[in-house]
Regions:
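N-terminal nucleotide-binding beta1-loop-alpha1 segment
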Residues: 159
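Alpha/beta catalytic cores of group-transfer enzymes, especially the acyltransferase/condensing modules
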Residues: 135
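ATP-dependent carboxylate activation and anion-phosphoryl transfer catalytic cores
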Residues: 7-16, 20-24, 48, 71-73, ...
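A polyampholytic, Gly/Pro-enriched intrinsically disordered region
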Residues: 122-131, 153-154
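Acidic/histidine-enriched active-site and ligand-binding environments that engage anionic O-linkages
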Residues: 147-156
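ATP-binding N-terminal substructure of ATP-dependent carboxylate-amine bond-forming enzymes
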Residues: 1-126, 138-146, 396
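Structural detector of well-ordered beta-strand residues that form the stable sheet scaffold
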Residues: 29, 79, 101-103, 131, ...
Length: 447
């Protein structure tokens, strides 16, 4: 087991990883920018190292400074959390060159899954169902029209190096295709420095289903069930559930088994999430995230297994602590992402939290690094906390969530809490009857 882990992140996930390390008896080092010197994870860590000014590129994305912090403190492993350098293959390779363990997959696997075209090819080879579309990058408009005609309209054009909805355009007819292609390539080039795009069939009313997987790097793989992340705004997840209200046990077992086998065959090590669009009983691969997800706590709630403990164990060479038959699903869990944003316009709302009170009681968990008097810096993601609620079934979970949201108090800034209080009273949400477009349509009604 590791002696000392450096946590290369900030906010709630840095505190989440720190807690896991302390439970395992591992010393902790956190790195931070000058804007985060009073953050909770900095206060609680055994050691902290300031690695630069507030801009991420000069601090949390500064590989040289993070490696230097490892060497200064004697850290033998790095946990990247999510975001920042968590899916940076170069970072993983540099750590390996310095004999420091990256708590995650190999640089090669990060590269494969980071290239959306190569990821789709790999998924197809591993037996994962994929969306009909081009085999690789689209070179010109003529090829785009040919592929679109073969798979049928509407189609969606996606950036090969993309994510978060950037470089993504829908064409409903051939007349739309030229503009959509040019716009997607332009956006992709500007956002990612790579204008390669590919085409897929556009699904009209899909759900977003993702499967949590783990590999030991030696040919074993397991799945921890699925999460439903269909409530989204501009391709950003807002509310997540486990398990999905749309799947039955047979579908869950089938897609989970496919994913676990794929991870084993790939020789993958650590945590990963295989994301799908789900429509009319069929799954279609979108991408694989080679890191811990923001929404991992809902999986922990229904399985009772600490996924960060599992990450650390696998990375240290201890292998998986569970077999597939050991993983049981109990009850239902929902996570709400509490952001420092206007609940209607979603504009950021940095500032000082004058009062912060979290809900409690059976089945309630709050992952947050903020506190009363904390000043939210304007430089980073607006997530200030996650409310995770577990119940014996979805009905109990929703009732408990309603109560927890009523108890949650954040004063001094605007947050998305009012949005969630509205959602828990909506009949569609109560029935689990929603798709990836539902939330944007709901919000548009109030504009």
């Amino acid at each position: 087991m590791f002696q000392k882990i450096l946590i290369a992140n900030r906010g709630e996930i840095a505190l989440r990883v720190l807690r896991a390390c302390k439970e395992l008896g591992i010393q902790t080092v956190v790195v931070h920018s000058t804007a985060d010197s009073d953050a909770m994870h900095v206060r609680l860590a055994d050691e902290s190292v300031c690695i630069g000014p507030p801009p991420s590129r000069e601090s949390y994305l500064n590989i040289h400074q993070i490696v230097a912090a490892c060497e200064i403190t004697g850290a033998d492993a790095v946990h990247p959390g999510y975001g920042f350098l968590s899916e940076n293959a170069k970072f993983a390779d540099i750590l390996a060159a310095h004999n420091i363990t990256f708590i995650g997959p190999s640089g090669d696997h990060i590269r494969i899954m980071g290239d959306k075209i190569e990821a789709k090819r790999t998924a197809k080879r591993l037996g994962i169902p994929v969306v009909p579309g081009s085999d690789g990058a689209i070179n010109d408009e003529k090829e785009a029209k040919r592929v679109a005609a073969e798979i049928g309209y509407p189609v969606i054009i996606k950036a090969s190096a993309g994510g978060g909805g950037r470089g993504m355009k829908v064409a409903h007819t051939e007349a739309d295709l030229e503009v959509a292609l040019q716009t997607a390539k332009s956006e992709a080039g500007a956002a990612f420095g790579d204008d390669a795009v590919y085409i897929e069939k556009y699904l009209e009313k899909p759900r977003h289903i993702e499967v949590q997987v783990f590999g030991d790097g030696a040919g074993r793989g397991v799945h921890f069930g699925e999460r439903d992340c269909s409530l989204q705004r501009r391709h950003q997840k807002v509310w997540e559930e486990a398990n999905s209200p749309a799947l039955n046990a047979e579908e869950r077992s089938r897609i989970g088994g496919i994913c676990a086998k794929a991870i084993a065959d790939l020789g993958y090590s650590g945590a990963g999430t295989i994301e799908f669009l789900y429509e009319n009983g069929e799954f279609y691969f979108i991408e694989m995230n080679t890191r811990l997800q923001v929404e991992h706590p809902v999986t922990e709630a229904i399985t009772g297994i600490d996924l960060v403990h599992e990450q650390i164990r696998v990375a240290s060479g201890g292998g998986l602590s569970v077999r597939q038959e050991d993983i049981k699903f109990n009850g239902h869990a929902i996570e709400c992402r509490i952001n420092a944003e206007d609940p209607r316009t979603f504009t950021p709302s940095p500032g000082t939290i004058t009062h912060f009170h979290t809900p409690g009681g059976l089945g309630i968990r709050v992952d947050s690094g903020v506190y009363s008097g904390y000043k939210i810096p304007p430089y980073y993601d607006s997530l200030i906390g996650k409310l995770i609620v577990h119940g014996r079934n979805r009905v109990e979970c929703m009732m408990r969530l309603r109560r927890a949201l009523d108890e949650f108090v954040v004063d001094g800034i605007k947050t998305t809490l009012p949005l969630f209080r509205d959602l828990v009273g909506n009949p569609d949400i109560a029935n689990g009857d929603y798709d990836i477009h539902w939330l944007e349509k709901y919000l548009a009604k109030d504009e």
